[in-house]
Structure formats: C-alpha cells, structure tokens
Swiss-Prot record:
Basic and acidic residues composition bias: residue spans: 161-170
Any one GO biological process: negative regulation of DNA-templated transcription
Protein name as catalogued: Transcriptional repressor NrdR
Organism encoding this protein: Hahella chejuensis (strain KCTC 2396)
Cofactor, how bound (note): Binds 1 zinc ion.
Region (Disordered) location: 150-170
Keyword ATP-binding set for record: yes
Function field: Negatively regulates transcription of bacterial ribonucleotide reductase nrd genes and operons by binding to NrdR-boxes.
Keywords in alphabetical order: ATP-binding, DNA-binding, Metal-binding, Nucleotide-binding, Repressor, Transcription, Transcription regulation, Zinc, Zinc-finger
Pfam name, any one: Zn_ribbon_NrdR
Similarity-based family: Belongs to the NrdR family.
Amino acid sequence: MHCPFCSAADTKVIDSRLVADGSQVRRRRECVSCSERFTTYEAAELVMPRVVKQDGTREPFDEDKLRAGFLKALEKRPVSMEEIEAAVDRIKFRLRATGERELNSRVIGEEVMSELRELDQVAFVRFASVYRRFQDLDEFRAEIDKLSRDAAASPMMSEKASNKDDVPTK
C-alpha cells in the first residue's frame, strides 16, 4: 500500500484487529520511508446479483429500494428498525448465496413476502395486495384465510402474531 504522506510504495503492518463484528480488519501501518503511521480498513467486497425486471430490463440490486419496500409495508406497524435491517440482511445473504449473477425480480419479491409474513401479518397482506395486484376483496379474504390456516398449523407464527397485539398503542 502506498503511503498517503510521501507516496512511497513500501509500508509495513504494525497491528491488525477485527472490527465491525468481524466483517472488517483494521490495520495500523507505518511507512518505511517517512515513518508516518496511518490506519486502513479492509472488508470483503460482496457483489450482489443484478436484477432482471419483468419487462426484461436489468439493473443493479438496490438495497435502498428493498428497505423502502419494507418501510412502506410496515408503516405504522409495531416493528423496529433493527428487525427491518435484520430482514434486509437475511435477504441479501440469501440472494448472494444463490451464486447467480442475475436474479428475476420475482425472487426478491417472494423473499420480501416471506420475511414480512414472519415480521407482521398485516404488513404482509398490505405488501401482497400491491405485489400480487389484488383486484377485489375476495383476493384479500383468500390471502387472510391462508394466513389463518398457516398460523393455526404453526404454533410459532401464532405466538408471534399474538405478541404483536400486546404492544401498547398511543
């Protein structure tokens, strides 16, 4: 690494430490020429797959767009930003884990719905109504009935739903 003070090409590492929950390495360096010290941070560059839209266009994965979708669906719902960020991180991890260079936007939409189903059932129905383009009340009823059946079959989901109702409102 070049010294930021004298531009010499030779520096030595004095100290290395893991930071940011082990996702970065902090290195203290010293220039061999001018003896100045400086700090660098090293992190893995994780490339997200490109998104293939329904019309066939391709665009880079946009984490902000993903987060905005969650925020819109969860507006005025009792879900913390930490839970939203964790859901975004889980989706990014699963998308990278596919190993694909490109993914259909439908895959991302289904991942969002899966996370919302666990976070907040009202937000799930809200998102699904837009994502799946519900046309009438029957489609809402069908989705809510499916959620009710799934919740009855899965005690964990029922417990999460009942805990959300215990949150005090203003």
